[in-house]
């Protein structure tokens, strides 16, 4: 792979506008993936520290010419983005000018059947971003029905989680993404041509559980709070309500304001604001959705870091 990204990331123009990268800026792309955001940030003249726990993404990024400049303008970190404070400290970087996060599975991972993230093509039931630790098959073939049901309900918002869990138990062992998709479709009923495959929620839930994605997001947001300089910008793209809820609540809690007891009462200042200029939810245009259907469910929220000290949990 060259320096040109193989996949166009969602809300690219909006993310770049939110970060407003300038030559000489030091930025973090917390979710490198195929490198779409990183490419745009590098083109602005910035230096980018890019994180990804997927070794395939890191291997592809290592071929980019910016990694070979002296000093390099692209520094790759094969680790979780929740570790960005410690990783950048090791690289001699105490603060950065901007952080971009694109949460969840990457297009590159979805398009590789052997990674086991999607049911559009049959592949091993894996779903691990890092390719280390227990796989989706390990979890589904060993967990009790109650645990599986809880995961499906909490992370997939699957209302019929217990029915699906019982069907999974009855069909074990499951080895491929096709095995899991067929079990879920049979349990819930699948009409050809339905707008949404009933297996979607189960795949999302299992993937989030296997990779600890929501805890990673929470820790990553606090890491960004600690790392951003005063005036630095945070931009987070999420793809479902669970993620967006976490981002929204984080920014609300960092705004320094508490909501009134009534919608008719104003918010009141309760602590120093950690972030200001907090945006409302930004959605992709119809034109972008037409170009890239995966953008349909995406939401961007962005904010600017103040000079208030980070909260203890951000350290």
From Swiss-Prot:
Known EC number: 2.1.1.199
Transmembrane segments: none
Superkingdom, natural source: Bacteria
Cysteine-cysteine disulfides: none
Cell location: Cytoplasm
Function: Specifically methylates the N4 position of cytidine in position 1402 (C1402) of 16S rRNA.
UniProt name for this protein: Ribosomal RNA small subunit methyltransferase H
